[in-house]
Amino acid sequence: GAVGRRLKGDEGGKWGVGYGVDLAVPVNYTSNVVVKQAYAEGRWLLGTLTVGAKEYPMELKNNELSSGSQTLGRNARPIPQVRLALPEYWTVPLTRGWLHLKGHIAYGKLTDGDWEGDFTARQTKYTEDVLYHSKAGYLKIGNEDVFCPWSFEVGLEMASLFGGRSYLPNGDGTMRVYNNGTGLKAYLDALIPGGAEANETQYKNVEGDQLGSWVMRINYENDDFMAAVYADKFFEDHSSMFQLDYDGYGSGDEWDVKKDHKYLLYDFKDWMLGAEVKL
C-alpha cells in the first residue's frame, strides 16, 4: 500500500511540502516487506529538495511507452539519496522565452551490500556500503508563446558509484580489503570525475564507476497532432563520452609519455532511438 502527499498540492505558493511511503509484501522473496518508496520533500519557488527513496520519471521520453533509459531509468527500485533539483524548465532571462533549462544533483547510498556478500558467498569480488551520485542538466530551445511548432531538447545524464569497501580474493581463501574514499574529496571526484581507485597503481583512471548518456529530442506540435524523435547515447568514461581518445603514447619505457598528436575515434554505437506520435 501507499500513502503520500504530492508537492503539487501547494502549487501556486512559494513553499510546498510533500511525502510518500509505498510498501509491498512479496511472496517467496528475500525480504518480508519491500520499501518501494519512502521520502520527504520540500519546494521553494522552483527548486526542490528530496530526502529518501523516490521514483523519478524519465526525461525526454514518453514514460508510458518507452522501454527505458540507459542511465537514469526506472527498471530498479530507487536509491535512498538527497536530491536538489530544478524539476521543471526555467526560462532563462534575456532570451525572449526561447531558452529553458532544468536539472538535478544527488548523493545517496546503495543498500544491497549484504546481498552482494551473500550472493558471492564472500568468495569473489564484492563491495559494501557503496555511495551513489547522479547529476543531469537539460536545455530546451523553443517558445510556446509564439507560433513555432518546433522545439529541440538536449541533455547530459551522469551517474557514479564510489566509496565503500571492496573485497578481493587472494586465492587462498582470504580476502584483501580496500577502503575506497568516502571523504569530501571523494564526493568532489564523483561530481567532477577525478582521483583514482584505492587499488590502482600505474594505470590510474578516475575514482569510482563513471557512466552516463547524452540525450536529445526533437518535437513538432500543433493543434492537430504531436510528433517527436529522441535519442539516448550511452557512454562510460571520458573517452566514450566524447568518442575520442588520445593514441600517441610511446612504447617501452616511454609507454606513458605523450609522443605524437594522434587520436582514436570510437565507433558510434550504444544508441537507443525512439519516436512518438500523438493524434
Spans of features found by a protein language model:
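Outer-membrane beta-barrel translocator domains and adjoining extracellular loop/strand segments
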Residues: 30-33, 61-68, 113-122, 165-171, ...
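Extracellular loop and loop/strand-boundary signature of outer-membrane beta-barrel proteins
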Residues: 22-26, 67-72, 120-125, 200-204, ...
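Residues on the lipid-exposed face of transmembrane beta-strands in outer-membrane beta-barrel proteins
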Residues: 2-5, 38-42, 51, 82-88, ...
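Residues that define the transmembrane beta-barrel architecture of outer-membrane proteins
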Residues: 1, 31-36, 76-85, 129-135, ...
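Short loop/turn motifs that connect adjacent beta-strands in outer-membrane beta-barrel proteins
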Residues: 4-17, 43-47, 89-103, 140-153, ...
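Surface-exposed loop and membrane-interface regions of Gram-negative outer-membrane beta-barrel proteins
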Residues: 10-44, 56-75
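Long, internal scaffold/assembly segments composed of regular secondary structure
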Residues: 152-154, 162-279
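Transmembrane beta-barrel strands of outer-membrane/channel proteins
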Residues: 17-25, 42, 49-55, 101-109, ...
